[in-house]
């Protein structure tokens, strides 16, 4: 007896995860008034009618492509300031997920959903600023939340996709209403302070100590220190 997987079964699994990812992207774009929701809607229609992923793959590229999207109020999207880091990290994760699945489908292979989630985007870099005059480093609330989103969302997206509960996850990100967010933010602030890095809720890019100009600074966290 052959040990090869049932072709029909694995294609149904491919269909399910691909459509889940696209539907989640469409909902996120719809909720935030992003015009790309129409493109994703066409992706879904084309795949369901012809099995082709070419329209979706055509969204990725250079300037003006889906790669350039940033969900924010400045771009006339429907979103609040606090939700921006979560919505954008979720969007990037869903884009990577749908792009990866589309390429597997195009190659006629079976999706290994666990492997896809393992290999998907995970930045885990904390961005802040450092004074060009006195050298004082600091992080802001928005960048702290962006880091936390890159840390917490992968597991949340995986669970939502596997359980077909992406609607609930999107709704939570757009508030944001993330489990243990306050505690996790305080943990990062404490780690930063232990490393001599200040924290500010302000959007001001000037030095908190001396008011001078600053430059972008990046830190990696190992879980215990920065």
Q: Across the structure, where does each feature detected by a protein language model lie?
A:
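Short terminal alpha-helical segments
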Residues: 1-43, 98, 102, 125-129
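Short, charged early-sequence alpha-helical segments and their helix-coil boundaries
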Residues: 50-85
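Short, charged low-complexity linear segments at domain edges
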Residues: 114-115, 168-192
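Short, flexible, mixed-charge glycine/proline-rich loop motifs
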Residues: 118-126, 194-202
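Short cysteine-rich clusters marking metal-coordination/redox-active sites
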Residues: 131-134, 207-210
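Short functional micro-motifs and their immediate structural scaffolds
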Residues: 136-139, 213-216
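Short Cys/His-rich "knuckle" micro-motifs
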Residues: 141-144, 217-221
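Short cysteine/histidine-rich metal-coordination sites, predominantly Zn2+-binding motifs
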Residues: 146-157, 210, 222-226
